[in-house]
Amino acid sequence: MIKKECMTAEWIKAISVRNKYKDLNLIEKVIRAMSLLEMLKLSGCPFCFKGGSALMLILGESAHRLSIDIDIICPPGTDIEPYLKDIEKFGFISKTLEERQQRDTNIPKSHSKFFYHIAYKNDDKPAYILLDVLYEDLQYHATEEVEIKGPFIELDNEPLMVTVPSADDILGDKLTAFAPNTSGIPYIKGGRDRSLEIIKQLYDVGKLFEHADNFQHTKDTFTQIGKIELQYRGLPAELSLIYEDIRETALCLATRGQMGKGDFNMLQSGIKKIDGYIYKGKYRIEEAIVDSARAAYLATSIEKSSTRIEKYDGNLNTLLAMELSPSVNNKLNKLKKVLPEAFFYWVKTSELLQK
């Protein structure tokens, strides 16, 4: 389990110095989120850990984005309340819990806030960690057990294990979320700007793309979750809507708003905001264009029933004979010199669309 000293100001500040990352608030939130995860595991709650925070465990040292919410899936009909009783033992002072149906959707969720006293500064106002529970049968084809550990925490014994989707499965899940006009996170929700959340999905798709190696699992999970998300939103159960949405959003990024159905200003805003959540490196528009090209290629590969995906090998000679098919706009040729990897995936996308 996580050592108690990890929730002290001294520890949080030491972690900040060690990682050259200044946001003490986010460091503490990551530690508290992992503590909440330990509580859920020890309570016996039946769950699968998913979402951005799960990627910190799935990707290990390759995970450079911090996530501070705990997203889990529980079987339909689960009563979550009995599993949330030991909050004081895990550093929390109170909680709120509400069952809800999200507005304008039929998504069965519960939403909780777990409050704690801030350790790194003297402040009477408590902070909180969010727990989102989705009550649904698992749509993943493979799960695995991973250790609860990370660069911000230290353990006093063997790490606890939690169930997470495979990298291939969660890639399919995340890909459906990068479709802001259909199955994914919308630009605006409840009057709030959600551009940061959209870009978080894109960033995760890019990271997972580098680790996934079972395209069939990615394809199957995308297909199942995509249909469910369309149903939740009252949209026709036509996956073609999602494929097109992903490509149009990627095209909007690739041409910096000149083409594609998307809100480039909001996407650009999300790219600027995500930097605060990345504790190693930066995420710029150029990286987002590459990741969105990967997303477009993945979505099109699923649409066209490909059996495998090809990955760019970094060799510029690979691009010499490559040309865009007429199925995509030739303005994307500009990527060949400036972002060769993005160009590679747009060529592959265009070839699939041309068939």
What are these regions (language model features)?
Residues 19-22, 71-77, 191:
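Short histidine-centered catalytic/ligand-binding loop motif
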